[in-house]
Amino acid sequence: MRYRKGAPLTSDTSFSRLMGDILIAFVALIGRPLSRLLYSIRIETKKPEKSRKLPSRAILISNHCMPLDPVFHGMAVFPRRTYFTLLEETCEAPVLGSLVRFLGGIPLPRSGTRLDDIEEAVSHGLANRGLVHFYPEGECFIGNQKIFPFKAGAFYFAIKSGVPVVPVVTILRRRNGRKSTRIQVTVRVLAPIVPPPCGKNAHATLVRSILFSNQVHDLMQAEIECSGGDNSLYRGPMPRIRGVND
């Protein structure tokens, strides 16, 4: 089940679905109590009353500031399941690669020659689970509350697929005052944002994707700031671990 370079980006067999169901149940069983114990996690929804449920199809967008973000964000949409994108190197790891693939991981090849394959994988994810999750900063910046610029790929796929973007914001605060080292995590699901239509050609669509990414970025940053996100917690990019994120 481990991904190998050049292989299909999604795997949807009876065995992989069964293993995915087992792993999701296990993560749900231990993830919530563990997250509450370690981070006093709160999961909130900031939407109009008429749209409390997630859209049937959507691109999820998150800032990436904690190694456990995939667990937190999976809890935020549970019982819905989502495909999620991650580094190609992570999916190639012998054990971890198989686990994340069972859970719905879509590797993002560094080669620009596989852009069509990525678009096909996103379409597959939207057709089968309805949700595909992106971290458009490109990597994890531990403790960061000043979101780095977004890459436009996720927003391009939202425009091409005609599906809304749902921002899922991670807000970090110190639990007991500014001298505390303990972190309180709030995951807030914002209202869906309808993308602009496709442009007249690929270049025009890309330009719209960049503008759309900036719009969503600024909205998420404003949410962090008005909620008291504490950027003094920032510790820099997640260290490179060979076979995991390097």
Which residues fall in each region the model found?
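Structured helix-beta-strand junction loops
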Residues: 37, 80, 102-103, 128-129, ...
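Non-catalytic C-terminal accessory region of glycerolipid acyltransferases
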Residues: 2-11, 15, 118-246
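Membrane-anchoring hydrophobic helices of lipid-metabolizing enzymes
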Residues: 1-59, 68-72, 97, 102, ...
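Short amphipathic alpha-helical segments and helix-helix/interface helices
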Residues: 31, 73-74, 97, 122, ...
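Proline- and acidic/polar-enriched loop/turn elements at helix boundaries
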Residues: 48, 89, 112, 137, ...
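Short, flexible loop segments at the rims of nucleotide/cofactor-binding pockets, characterized by
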Residues: 34-40, 60-62, 108-113, 143-145
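Catalytic core of membrane glycerolipid acyltransferases/transacylases, capturing the structured
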Residues: 52-112
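A generic secondary-structure micro-motif detector
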Residues: 20-21, 85-86, 111, 119, ...
